[in-house]
Amino acid sequence: MDSKWSRRTGSLLLLLVSNLLLCKSTASLPICPSGAVNCQVSLRDLFDRAVILSHHIHKLSSEMFNEFDKRYTQGRGFITKAINSCHTSSLSTPEDKEQAQQIHHEDLLNMVLRVLPSWNDPLYHLVTEVRGMQEAPDAILSKAIEIEEQNRRLLEGMEKIVGQVHPGIKENEIYSVWSGLPSLQMADEDARLFAFYNLLHCLRRDSHKIDNYLKLLKCRIIYDSNC
């Protein structure tokens, strides 16, 4: 009986590891191979990749926030100051699935294309400033680097999706400008740590929104809301 249990446990662990590796490898795949000419990817495949990417980004951002919170901010009461102080708060976006379901899919796509580029600068500077932190855990830095890369890939994929769903639509140039770099470089430790905490809190919030929006959009556009 012990040998059967061991074989069964080993098989389950192997299956779990295989699924995790598949998810990570899919998330790291480019939309088109490097140097490809006239690359065509089906709308279903584009949405599949976008949903995997957005879920992966949200998972990483949640883990990074939790690691930073545990290491740097215990007992500082930052959560009470972080509410509604995100640089993307100026963008009108639904707060939950119920609100998102009331919005036309074209408007929801435009919202995604406003939020994603709003994170290009913050993520770039987040990586730079985390590198300069004393004793910054490798886990936090590696996640910041990966999120920055995957956010660019997701934006690229979303532009291709919009190109197929609404051909000829003008490129969306409306996004929220981030001006928080000086806060990440402040000499006062509490103020600087709060700036990092708030940025990671907002990243977790926005990545969760994007993840929900894309799952809803995939359900509507690919499965005609039958999911």
From Swiss-Prot:
It is found in: Secreted. InterPro entries: 4_helix_cytokine-like_core (IPR009079), Somatotropin/Prolactin (IPR001400), Somatotropin_CS (IPR018116). Keywords: Disulfide bond, Hormone, Lactation, Phosphoprotein, Secreted, Signal. PROSITE patterns: SOMATOTROPIN_1, SOMATOTROPIN_2. One of its GO terms (biological process) is positive regulation of receptor signaling pathway via JAK-STAT. GO terms for cellular component: extracellular space. Residues 1-28 form the signal peptide. It comes from the Eukaryota. GO terms for molecular function: hormone activity; prolactin receptor binding. The modification Phosphoserine is found at S54, S62, S118. Disulfide bonds join C32-C39, C86-C202, C219-C227. Pfam families: Hormone_1. Interacts with PRLR. PANTHER family: PROLACTIN (PTHR11417:SF5), SOMATOTROPIN,PROLACTIN (PTHR11417). Prolactin acts primarily on the mammary gland by promoting lactation. Belongs to the somatotropin/prolactin family. This is Prolactin. It comes from Oryctolagus cuniculus (Rabbit). The lineage of its organism: Eukaryota, Metazoa, Chordata, Craniata, Vertebrata. The gene is PRL.
